[in-house]
Design a protein with these regions (language model features):
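C-terminal edge beta-strand
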Residues: 1-3, 100-116, 127, 196-211
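Extracellular ectodomain surface segments
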Residues: 3-50, 118-155
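Extracellular/surface recognition and adhesion modules
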Residues: 44, 53-55, 76, 121, ...
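Low-complexity "stalk/linker" and mucin-like segments enriched in Ser/Thr/Pro/Ala/Gly
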Residues: 48-72, 155-170, 241
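Extracellular/luminal low-complexity segments enriched in Ser/Thr/Pro
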Residues: 75-86, 172-182, 249, 316-318, ...
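Exposed beta-strand face motif in extracellular beta-rich ectodomains
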Residues: 87-91, 183-187
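Conserved structural position at the C-terminal beta-strand
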Residues: 95-97, 191
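Feature responds to low-complexity, polar/acidic, surface-exposed segments characteristic
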Residues: 126-131, 207-226, 239-261, 265-293, ...
Length: 409
């Protein structure tokens, strides 16, 4: 399953104000995939653009093919010109290790010369969970005070699975456990801003559990909602169809208003009313019998209000495909979330979609991402995969509350 990767030193970036000196430390030259292997020296293969400045060691300019011992790297400097003709440059080197090997690919160091100070981003530790043989999609959690675009880099790889980073350098990643592995796994990452600042390392911890259900879906491998679909089955909230000895989740199937309401109520533990024959909505006859108890309980709790038809009468539209905005409002009410500042947790600030406040509340709670709070996303119909991920996030909120000693119902 696991191929032992060769030791390497990842590409990195540094910056300084124009005219200042870039300094280096041992931490900049940390060995990745080394398993105890240490760096002994580096061989400079490409020098920085002389129009930006000069790379020196002990005050003396370095030439191409110069060898710098690891013990001397703290004396490495890049002196910026006071009036550089270029403000971004690179140099490269080949690392040599104490096992006698040299890296197959050079490490590239990007140097940024700034006209104003720029703070490093902050990367946060993360805790995720999945099931045996189920890949999960995650998003690195980092912020930058200047709002710079961030890219991400692994510093330490996991032992029980593999991590695939997004090709576009975004925060998205996929963790795939090795076959039949369970238990705790972890890896570390850093965030790098567009000025070349690198955050401190943050740790992603992943718990790989054996699912408490026999349900496995034939149509969910590789789907970002795979883990969520298994969790809904495990929690007794929803199980897909069973045909010819296999379970199918139908991730692209639209979800109706009645379906999402009943699943969301089951998620938070809110019981439907019993022996309900009529809900009070004008379109009551179109509400499935199995949903009437849930609809009535939700109305009484203020979770739903329905809408008005052309004559002004209240209707629920039970069989209509629910939009992400409508689902967001339902879940916000069921979780009893506090309102958060729109300008912080909304992709559109004060000009948000009518469901923008609910979406911001869910984003602040980690149920959805801020990028999912815009009008376009909230106006689209919800499919089963999206519903599963919403409810999976809600279960995480409830689990955290249980740890904190507070339950919503």
């Amino acid at each position: 399953n696991k191929n032992t990767p060769s030791p390497t030193i990842p590409d990195f970036s540094k910056n300084a104000l124009v005219g200042d000196t870039v300094t280096f430390s041992d931490q900049d030259f940390s060995v990745q995939n080394g398993d105890g292997i240490k760096l002994t020296s580096i061989t400079i293969t490409v020098l920085p653009d002389p129009g930006a400045g000069t790379l020196t060691l002990g005050g003396q300019p370095l030439a191409a093919d110069s060898v710098v011992k690891a013990s001397a790297l703290a004396g490495l400097r890049f002196q910026s010109l006071s009036q550089p003709s270029v403000t971004t440059t690179t140099f490269s080197f080949l690392p040599t290790f104490d096992n006698g090997t040299q890296a197959q690919q050079p490490t590239t160091v990007t140097l940024y010369l700034l006209t104003a100070a720029n703070e490093a981003p902050i990367a946060r530790n993360m805790d995720l969970s999945t099931y045996k043989n189920v890949a999960i999609t995650g998003y690195f959690d980092a912020v930058d005070s200047e709002g710079d675009t961030l890219t991400f880099q692994l510093m330490d790889t996991p032992a029980r699975g593999a991590v695939t980073l997004a090709e576009d350098g975004s925060a998205k990643f996929v963790y795939t456990p090795y076959e039949n592995k369970t238990g705790k796994d972890s890896f570390t990452y850093v965030a790098i801003d567009s000025a070349g600042n690198t955050s401190s390392e943050a740790k992603v911890t992943i718990q790989i559990n054996k699912p408490d259900t026999k349900v496995t879906y034939a149509d969910m491998e590789g789907d970002p909602a795979h883990k969520a679909s298994i969790r809904l089955a495990e929690e007794g909230i929803f199980v897909g169809s069973y045909l010819n000895g296999e379970y199918f989740f139908d991730p692209d199937r639209p979800v109706t208003r009645a379906e999402f309401l009943t699943m969301a109520m089951a998620t938070v533990g809110m019981a439907p009313l019993e022996d309900v024959t009529t809900t009070g909505f004008t379109d009551d006859a179109a509400i499935p019998t199995w949903a009437k108890g849930a609809v009535s309980a939700a109305v009484m709790a203020g979770v739903i209000q329905g809408s008005r038809d052309d004559s002004g009468a209240p209707v629920f539209d039970a069989s209509e495909n629910i939009t992400q905005g409508e689902a967001t409002v339902m879940l916000d009410q069921l979780l009893n979330l506090s309102d958060v500042p729109l300008e912080v947790f909304s992709a559109q600030g004060s000009d948000a979609h009518w469901a923008g406040q609910a979406a911001a509340n869910l984003a602040a709670s980690g149920v959805i991402r801020v990028e999912e709070t815009n009008s376009a996303a909230l106006s689209t119909g919800l499919d089963r995969a999206q519903a599963a991920m919403l409810l999976d996030g809600a279960l995480d909120v409830l689990s955290q509350r249980e740890e904190d000693g507070w339950l919503p119902w």
